[in-house]
């Protein structure tokens, strides 16, 4: 993939954010969002490559062929808007009211993509390479997006030295927090199958409910850990319990529950899955039925250790915002969990307080300030690593 010569072009991050928001790319739809982005990147001298898996559009773009390769990762897909009528401005109109940009994706995370593109436009000459890894499958099942692109790039021998993910990591003020790691996540669907019968004749039935209660009690009784350096304690939550029984005189045939564990690096997903399966087997001993657990690991816990890379980011954010960010591992999962397989990864973006909400919005000056922070990051990065 040969990059055209870098071109000096000025890009307004707010205008590009508006152009992206006007593409109604509700996951898994693309709605032309990738085309909009690709045109801008090609104008800046990037060699762009579409990587489609299933029905999902992904884009890998690179300017330069040498190392180090600094990558920006993000997603153009967005969550559904909910009730259109509840919005102050149309969710895909990208309207600016009193200095605030409204629209689905304004925070999560089309404005961050636009800000990094604008930053790159202001640094036309740099050593090494700059790349973009953009997916249309982050808000959905996340099976044909970043994870597949990472696997393909690794198989081809593509080297990414460091990555910035533009998720909205700031808590209250732009630049007050960056994420250097994330907890892992595992979901378990637990099913206990018994035998339906009349409550007056329990000997003719096999009640799955007490078995499910025993399983859930055992899972909740265990203290998974007391925390891990840089991480809060791992946590298990019961998210659903269902027997599908509306009668008061019927023992149900089956009982189901779902649990989620957010875990720190003290655990591996496979070990937690084995533990859940073991508790199911233990509770079902002597029961005239079966208890099973279907476990799915969404991602393992990871940490990018503080060092030269995080120092560059902290300095750049401080330069642009006047505040030194907290290095955090809080929050949910992101595509950083896949990128960690390629290189050290850190997340930094806008304040996330309105993401996924009606009236998702961001002050336009914060979009421009984020572009300035990204530009400072790019310059500091190549000064440190090239």
UniProtKB/Swiss-Prot annotation:
Pathway this chain belongs to? Amino-acid biosynthesis; L-lysine biosynthesis via DAP pathway; LL-2,6-diaminopimelate from (S)-tetrahydrodipicolinate (succinylase route): step 3/3
Q: Which UniProt keywords apply?
A: Amino-acid biosynthesis, Cobalt, Diaminopimelate biosynthesis, Hydrolase, Lysine biosynthesis, Metal-binding, Zinc
Entry's Gene Ontology molecular function annotations: acetylornithine deacetylase activity; cobalt ion binding; succinyl-diaminopimelate desuccinylase activity; zinc ion binding
Required cofactor(s)? Zn(2+); Co(2+)
Q: What is its EC number?
A: 3.5.1.18
Q: Catalytic center at which residues? A: 77, 138 (proton acceptor)
Q: Which domain of life is it from?
A: Bacteria
UniProt entry tagged with the keyword Metal-binding? yes
Root EC class: hydrolase
Pfam families assigned to the protein according to its UniProt record, in alphabetical order: M20_dimer, Peptidase_M20
Q: How is the cofactor bound?
A: Binds 2 Zn(2+) or Co(2+) ions per subunit.
In terms of InterPro entries, this protein maps to:
Bact_exopeptidase_dim_dom (IPR036264), DapE_proteobac (IPR005941), Peptidase_M20 (IPR002933), Peptidase_M20_dimer (IPR011650), Peptidase_M20A (IPR050072)
Residues annotated as binding Zn(2+) 2 are 108, 139, 356
Q: Which NCBIfam families match?
A: dapE_proteo, PRK13009.1
- Cited function: Catalyzes the hydrolysis of N-succinyl-L,L-diaminopimelic acid (SDAP), forming succinate and LL-2,6-diaminopimelate (DAP), an intermediate involved in the bacterial biosynthesis of lysine and meso-diaminopimelic acid, an essential component of bacterial cell walls.
How this chain assembles, per its entry, is: Homodimer.
Which protein, by its recorded name, is this?
Succinyl-diaminopimelate desuccinylase
């Amino acid at each position: 993939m040969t990059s055209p010569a870098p071109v000096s072009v000025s890009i307004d991050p707010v205008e590009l954010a508006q152009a992206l928001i006007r593409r109604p790319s509700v996951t898994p739809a693309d709605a032309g969002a990738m085309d909009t982005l690709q045109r801008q990147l090609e104008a800046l001298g990037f060699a762009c490559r579409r990587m489609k898996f299933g029905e999902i559009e992904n884009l890998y773009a690179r300017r330069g062929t040498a190392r180090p390769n600094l990558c920006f990762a993000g997603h153009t897909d967005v969550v559904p808007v909910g009730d259109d009528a509840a919005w102050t401005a149309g969710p895909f109109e990208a309207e600016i009211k009193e200095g605030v940009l409204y629209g689905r994706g304004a925070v999560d995370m089309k404005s961050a993509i636009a800000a990094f593109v604008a930053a790159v436009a202001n640094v036309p000459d740099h050593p090494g390479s700059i790349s973009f890894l953009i997916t249309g499958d982050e808000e959905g099942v996340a099976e044909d997006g970043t994870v597949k692109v990472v696997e393909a790039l690794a198989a081809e021998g593509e080297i990414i030295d460091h990555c910035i993910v533009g998720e909205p990591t700031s808590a209250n003020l732009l630049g007050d927090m960056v994420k250097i790691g994330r907890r892992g996540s595992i979901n378990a669907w637990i099913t206990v199958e018994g035998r339906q019968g009349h409550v007056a004749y329990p000997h003719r039935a096999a009640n799955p409910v007490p078995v499910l209660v025993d399983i859930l009690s055992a899972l909740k009784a265990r203290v998974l850990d007391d925390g891990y350096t840089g991480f809060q304690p791992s946590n298990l939550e019961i998210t659903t319990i269902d027997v599908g029984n509306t009668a008061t005189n019927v023992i149900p045939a089956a009982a189901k529950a779902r649990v989620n564990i957010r875990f720190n690096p003290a655990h591996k997903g496979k070990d937690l899955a084995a533990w859940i399966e073991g508790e199911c087997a233990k509770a079902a001993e002597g029961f005239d039925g079966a208890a099973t657990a279907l476990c799915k690991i969404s991602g393992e816990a990871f940490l990018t250790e503080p060092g030269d890379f995080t120092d560059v980011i902290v300095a750049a954010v401080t330069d642009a915002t006047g505040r030194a960010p907290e290095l955090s591992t809080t929050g949910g999962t992101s595509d950083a969990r896949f990128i960690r397989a390629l290189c050290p990864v850190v997340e930094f973006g806008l304040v996330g307080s309105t993401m996924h909400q009606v009236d998702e919005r961001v002050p336009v000056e914060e979009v421009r300030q984020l572009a300035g922070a990204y530009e400072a990051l790019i310059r500091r990065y190549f000064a440190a690593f090239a």
